[in-house]
Amino acid sequence: MNTISPVVIEPRHGGEHHSVNVKYGIIIFAISVIHILFFLLVKFIEINRWKSNGRFNKSLWKLNNTPTWMLITLWILIIFFIGGANITEFSEEYITIAKRYGRIAYCLLPLNIYLILRPTNCVYLKPGYYLENLSLHKWLSRLISICTLIHAIGYFYKWNKEGKILIKSFRFLNFLGIVVFVMFAVLIIVSIRILRRKYYSLFYIIHNITAWSMVVLIIFHARPGVTIFGIICLILMCYQLLYLRFYKSYPVNNLKIVDIPMSTLQIIKIPKPSNFPTWLPGSHVRLNYTTSNIKSWINSSHPFTIANIPEDGVNYLSLVIKKPGNFIIDQYLTYLLTGPYISIDYPFYNSANLINIICGGSGISFGLPILNHYKSLNSNIPIKLIWCVRNRNDCFIMNQLDMTNVEVFITSAGDSSSDEQSPSSSSYQPVPLFVVDDEQDESHAKVEQTQGEEEVDGLLNQDENGIPLQSMKKESFPKKEEGEDEEKSSKDVFKYGRPKFDEVFAIDDPTLNPNYNDSWVIACGPDQLIEDAKYWSQEKGYRFFSEKYEM
């Protein structure tokens, strides 16, 4: 009698191998939670200690600002070892590795979304200083893309080897994964720096569609399921997109635009919402279109630093912005405003004993409120602010903001060589200030025309003919008295060339012996300006802080 051997039917996903990778996803998520809690705790301790003893703690600050390359290297090592754990024969278990990297990619999403959360006016928690997290978010996104790519390559190889690549690709649940993979491939291309900067709106749309698609579609695509991680991601994304937009935003209208034709800058005055909280100097807000405007959903909100301080007692927020920009403000539209968002750790304002600030172009909106804050306190702390512009017409903003004691450099080679071209020059024509609003009491200024010089990166890379600066007050634009030497007046207002840090930031009081642990250099502007200021601050032993608005 023939005995029929029982046929063992292997489960579709490989029996125990079907769920073998679940624990590795949980491990990645657990490490992500540890990462979040660790830096939350470090930031909280740093702020509290700094506040309580009035001393900047270098060790805690370094720990809180661990270099991105170091964190990403650590994550690469973690992913590499977890991705290859218990794999003995790559040629036989490559599909297990492919599955594992797909799960790793998805389980990293909660951390990556957390890094871009923007709670407003949150002084004790790491997300309150969300700008500190953006670099890590970018690189972690790239790491997730690589894990996704490994997952896709593994499966395409397997299906091609079996001769079923088309059949398997168009099975519904598999097809969902392919859709996400294609989106990631496109996102990687438009994320290339030159393309991202040129087509930022396109990049932003693809970025958001890819993010939402991955979170939602992979919930159905992944087997075993990743529902719990998907729910966490959706909660975080809904907070960012919906809660901040509908419950923590302020509708603003009747904006006032102060401008002159030849300037590269303009001032936007936004009526301060009645319940808008007090903000720290250097804080910024974000503007977006209202929810009824399609642009609100497909374009990013835009950050602008508040150039005035609460102590000014005015009922509006002043923004200094560069024109033309990707976000053109129309005074007749209503916008949604969120914020304020903090930039510098708030104990800085109670502990610094010497501050040197250098700003380029619209970066004046970051340095100026810090200067004016200390002036409002009648503080004896030595503080200097240097403002560098290429276009002399940009100085019209001095009639709109309190820029007393701001020292100004005109770095344009054209202006420098013409020294100069004074108001008495035959090429000089007065350019009246115009205000796009109904107010009649705005100041008027006469400023000189240039040949359309634009502010560019490398603002300070001009000839090193730096001239020691002198203070520049709002009164530096006086109405000319009859018989006044106009050429001399013009030269007194501006200095030309590149500022020499050793000269402009020289300590005026020879008896002053500053505590370098709480002495600061602050820079805001183009990359080259920031790099120069950082190098000088390190040479002198100062603490350094910089502000960039680019992604």
UniProtKB/Swiss-Prot annotation:
One Gene Ontology CC term in the entry: plasma membrane
Assigned keywords, A-Z: Electron transport, FAD, Flavoprotein, Ion transport, Membrane, NADP, Oxidoreductase, Transmembrane, Transmembrane helix, Transport
Domain Ferric oxidoreductase, first and last residues per copy: 102-217
Domain spans labelled FAD-binding FR-type: 247-369
EC number: 1.16.1.-
Chain intervals for the UniProt region annotation (Disordered): 440-492
Membrane topology term: Multi-pass membrane protein
Principal location class: membrane
InterPro entries tied to this protein: FAD-bd_8, Fe3_Rdtase_TM_dom, Fe_red_NAD-bd_6, FNR_nucleotide-bd, RBOH/FRE
SUPFAM superfamilies recorded: Ferredoxin reductase-like, C-terminal NADP-linked domain
Membrane-spanning parts: 25-45, 67-87, 100-117, 138-155, 172-192, 199-221, 225-247
Domain of life of the organism encoding this protein: Eukaryota
Compartments, as annotated in UniProt: Membrane
Gene Ontology annotations of biological process type: reductive iron assimilation
Biased amino acid composition, Basic and acidic residues: 472-492
GO molecular-function terms, A-Z: ferric-chelate reductase activity
Role: Probable cell surface metalloreductase. May be involved in iron or copper homeostasis.
Listed PANTHER family: METALLOREDUCTASE AIM14-RELATED, NADPH OXIDASE
Family: Belongs to the ferric reductase (FRE) family. AIM14 subfamily.
Name of the molecule in the record: Probable metalloreductase AIM14
Organism: Candida tropicalis (strain ATCC MYA-3404 / T1)
Lineage per the UniProt record: Eukaryota, Fungi, Dikarya, Ascomycota, Saccharomycotina
